[in-house]
A protein has these predicted regions:
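N-terminal type II signal-anchor transmembrane helix
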Residues: 2-52
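A structural signal for short, hydrophobic/glycine-enriched beta-strand patches
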Residues: 35-193
Length: 193
């Protein structure tokens, strides 16, 4: 009789441990997936194509077009990802979506300056220097949005970045009270870059 009781207790203990492990696994996987789904669903309605952003110029008067940094090459030129962001921002500027472009990127080291590369590229593509503003402390998406609101006093903007990044950028912008629209800059296949 005692052996059966010990086996029953051991079985219940094993079932409890397995149940707990499954619960923890569900929480560890489910909570981040749920949060990600919520961020995507809450920001997606404010995404626009380049054509929509240009057509909505009068309805949405943006203070600025914001380009988020994405790395530079060893020679100081924009990476392929950053180049696409800059090209889309240039097109939006030329469509008069906003009167200025804010380049926000990493310049935390004297030998690495995303923002200078971004501004140089935009100027070479015909954007007037007086309409380019540089945020040299955009070390993260959060930092960029914080500085847009608190340093550059942006109330409304069009954020340009790749779609995968746009959700987070839009979420952070809204968290700081910025009325933002997002335009994805997925012009290339980046799988080999």
């Amino acid at each position: 009789m005692g052996t059966k009781r010990k086996k029953g207790c051991l079985r219940r203990l094993i079932e409890a441990v397995i149940g707990f492990v499954l619960f923890v696994a569900l929480v560890v996987v489910g909570v981040p997936l749920g949060i990600n789904a919520w961020v995507c669903a809450s920001t997606r309605p404010a995404f626009e194509s380049q054509a929509q952003a240009a057509a909505n110029v009068d309805a949405f008067e943006a203070d600025a077009i914001v380009v988020l940094g994405a790395g530079i090459n060893w020679d100081g030129s924009p990476s392929a990802v950053l180049k696409d962001r800059l090209d889309v921002a240039d097109d939006l500027y030329n469509a008069r979506v906003a009167p200025k472009i804010i380049m926000s990127g990493d310049n935390s080291d004297s030998s690495y300056n995303e923002v200078m590369a971004m501004a140089k590229y935009a100027k070479a593509n015909g954007i007037p220097a007086e309409d380019i503003f540089c945020d040299h402390a955009g070390l993260s998406t959060y930092d960029s949005m914080y500085r847009l609101k608190n340093v550059f006093n942006v109330q409304r903007c069009v954020i340009v970045t790749q779609e995968y990044h746009l959700y987070r950028a839009m979420y952070d912008a809204r968290g700081f009270g910025i009325d933002a629209r997002g335009v994805a800059s997925d012009l290339s296949d980046y799988s080999n870059k």
